[in-house]
């Protein structure tokens, strides 16, 4: 058994140590918000936070995250930055098909947690590992700026 802290709750899972965190989340814990996209950490759909850092769960062995704080898309509304990103995503009407959105949102939150006033270049660099097949990159950038403005006003 491997003990994990996910979204503030302790969970024990029976999984091989080399099982990707993505599959533990989806299959063992039935947390399906984190998506499978490529399996090689190139698309960003599987992004979660490990101790606050955006991390690709498709290549992260579950044994590597025991004892660390894991945050998934299911818990993003629990903090100010997450709430602002969720609200901005809806205001700017970012999602089209929606498949990549959980990874996009997780990467955006990680950026805004470190940088409260990102430039376009900062956003592009932070989001460069996330692919949107629908091409909503300009809306994503606008939503991140909107969320940044919201969080600065609340500070």
Language-model regions: role of each:
Residues 1-155:
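Signature of N-terminal electron-transfer/Fe-S-associated modules in redox systems
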């Amino acid at each position: 058994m491997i003990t994990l802290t996910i979204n503030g709750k302790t969970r024990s899972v029976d999984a091989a140590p080399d099982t990707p965190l993505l599959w533990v989340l989806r299959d063992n814990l039935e947390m399906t918000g984190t998506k499978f996209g490529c399996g090689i950490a190139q698309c960003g759909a599987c992004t979660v936070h490990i101790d606050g850092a955006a991390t690709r769960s498709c290549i992260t062995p579950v044994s590597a995250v025991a004892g660390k704080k894991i945050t998934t898309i299911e818990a993003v509304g629990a903090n100010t930055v997450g709430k602002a990103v969720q609200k901005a995503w809806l205001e700017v009407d970012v999602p089209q098909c929606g498949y990549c959105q959980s990874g996009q949102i997780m990467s955006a939150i990680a950026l805004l947690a470190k940088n409260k006033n990102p430039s376009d270049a900062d956003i592009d660099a932070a989001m460069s590992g996330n692919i949107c097949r629908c091409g909503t990159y300009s809306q994503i950038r606008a939503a991140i700026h909107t969320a940044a403005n919201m969080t600065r006003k609340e500070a």
